[in-house]
Amino acid sequence: MNMKDDLVIVGGGPAGLAAAVEAKRNGIDSILVIERAKELGGILQQCIHNGFGLHEFKEELTGPEYAQRFMDQLFELNIEYKLDTMVLGISENKIVQAINSIDGYMIIEAKSIILTMGCRERTRGAIAIPGDRPAGIFTAGAAQRYINMEGYMVGKRVVILGSGDIGLIMARRLTLEGAKVLAVAELMPFSGGLMRNIVQCLDDYDIPLYLSHTVVDIIGKDRVEKVIIAKVDENKKAIPGTEIEYECDTLLLSVGLIPENDISRATGIKIDPRTNGPIVNELMETSIPGIFASGNVVHVHDLVDFVSIESRKAGKSAAKYIKGEVTDGEYIEVQTGNGIGYTVPQKFRMENIEKNLELSMRVRQIYKNVKIVVKSNDFVIHSVKKNHMAPGEMEKITLSKTVLGKIDANKIVVEVVEEDK
């Protein structure tokens, strides 16, 4: 089956929905959203807790409520979508191959594509935990789906490895469902989640958080019977004699998220090794002109509100590209200096910036009373004071056209600088 669409969006989660709605509002009528699940909304459908929408809608919503707001806009604008449909591949000249049980094999010619595939969880195999291989070991997201959508309880006595936001939220969810969460162990000396989740999900329920600890052994024949954690040194190696044993039946893993970029790599899109997502410019455009990306497929976000904001930019940019309104120009590279893990975008052209450029980034460690500084040729063109920064919380800085006008090189450097005493 051969089809033609102006814009194809791969992924019908919060990023794909926001991008589709924005593209339609910017004059693109022929849009197709492709989603491999049986419903739109992506991961939000299993996030039944509240805390979503504070930035986007100025009110607190649950995940399904937030998704429904965007789905309603999609339906209202009559944007076409296909569910239960798998994208098999994308070519550089923007031909999408997809398959489902109704239409069969489809070849879709597009003028532009937006990648919004989200991310997946890192598994036990990826982090090589030693020990037996019994039942009762789940990723936090899988446990979340079992409990919130399928109605199955995953265990009664639980240990959680990793303090990412999903792990913290599942510590609370399991407690509310009647399980006993014995401990949360985190390999790093700081939590990987938002401070508000540590307070609301662990502190409020007296669940201990062990920083600089990891699982060193899993014991169990058919089902998990015991999990042993131990303190680690600065090289992340377990310190003998610091072991703590927990008799439990379940181990949850919240050990990081990986942007879902198998299709991106196969298409030949350049990937940033720091984010594991596509390298993008000021328009959220990848290294292949006309193919854009946004949301967790580019870099992992803390808040879905920020995913929506970023995806609207991608939707608007794709509309501009289709209408031939994108201006080419010299790229200015954004380099990371002291303390900065990555930035998005990684490069930009002055010609396409209307009012300002927003840079998203994460720091490498916890900082207090510092400045984020932007330099051009070792000259500070912008600085922002920060009382507290942590790797678990994404930072954003906005560079105005006036600031950008001070750049006199083909690169800028973003770094953390200690406050002058």
Task: Report each predicted region and the residues it spans.
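Exposed aromatic-hydrophobic patches
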Residues: 360, 392-403
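A Rossmann-like FAD-binding core segment of flavoenzymes
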Residues: 69-91, 96-98, 175-262, 355-386
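Predominantly flavin-linked oxidoreductase catalytic cores and closely associated redox partners
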Residues: 105-106, 115-209, 214-223, 290, ...
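Beta1-alpha1 glycine-rich phosphate/pyrophosphate-binding loop at the start
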Residues: 5-69, 73, 145, 154-200
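Short, aromatic- and glycine-rich surface loops/edge beta-strands on solvent-exposed regions
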Residues: 372-374, 402-421
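FAD-site-proximal beta/loop scaffold in flavoenzymes
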Residues: 115, 137-147, 250-301
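FAD-binding core/adjacent interface of flavoenzyme oxidoreductases
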Residues: 1-10, 68-157, 233-241, 252, ...
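Mid-to-C-terminal Rossmann-like scaffold of FAD/NAD(P)H-dependent oxidoreductases
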Residues: 305-306, 313, 317-384
